[in-house]
């Protein structure tokens, strides 16, 4: 199982999530995405996309703004991190990529049965096919219908 916590704005979240999906497909692993609603990207994943994997929404809008959601988000992160055989922080991911490239990172992921990865960038090379799974949600299609037709 690969658990990804994509960070740092919508673009970086899409890079992290898309590359984690590609790695999960390559390794035949289940993917779980810890989607953070935060000041820079305060939107639920299901409001944007119809995704083919499990998404767990957590809030990082601060204790003063959303105390219950903030506490729940912290509990969910602890729960899922505890399930992992290994936890990689953003800096760990970048250090592995710098030293060993994407192949080195893939080897680390492949070695662990359950890995929790916090990342603000891609975990592998991406191409247009890597993003093909991103389908707009019904709400986005409805709102964008005048633009799409």
What residue ranges belong to the model's regions?
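Extreme N-terminal starter segment of soluble prokaryotic enzymes
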Residues: 1-2
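A short, glycine/small-residue-rich beta-strand->loop->alpha-helix junction that serves as a flexible
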Residues: 6-15
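Short, flexible loop/turn elements at secondary-structure junctions
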Residues: 8-9, 37, 121
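Histidine-anchored nucleotide/phosphate-binding helix
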Residues: 14-25
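Structural alpha-beta junctions
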Residues: 25-30, 53-56
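A short beta-strand-loop structural module common to alpha/beta enzyme folds
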Residues: 29-40
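Secretory-pathway luminal glycosyltransferase catalytic domains
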Residues: 41-149
């Amino acid at each position: 199982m690969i658990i990804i916590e994509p960070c740092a704005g919508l673009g970086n979240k899409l890079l992290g999530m898309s590359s984690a999906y590609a790695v999960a497909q390559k390794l035949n692993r289940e993917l779980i995405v810890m989607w953070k609603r935060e000041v820079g990207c305060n939107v639920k994943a299901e409001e944007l996309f119809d995704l083919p994997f499990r998404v767990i929404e957590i809030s990082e809008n601060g204790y003063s703004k959303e105390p219950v959601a903030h506490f729940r988000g912290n509990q969910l992160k602890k729960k899922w991190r505890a399930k992992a055989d290994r936890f990689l922080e953003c800096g760990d991911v970048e250090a592995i990529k710098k030293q060993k490239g994407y192949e080195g990172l893939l080897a680390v992921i492949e070695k662990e049965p359950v890995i929790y990865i916090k990342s603000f960038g891609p975990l592998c090379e991406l191409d247009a096919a890597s993003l093909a799974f991103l389908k707009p949600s019904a709400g986005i299609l409805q709102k964008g219908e005048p633009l799409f037709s």
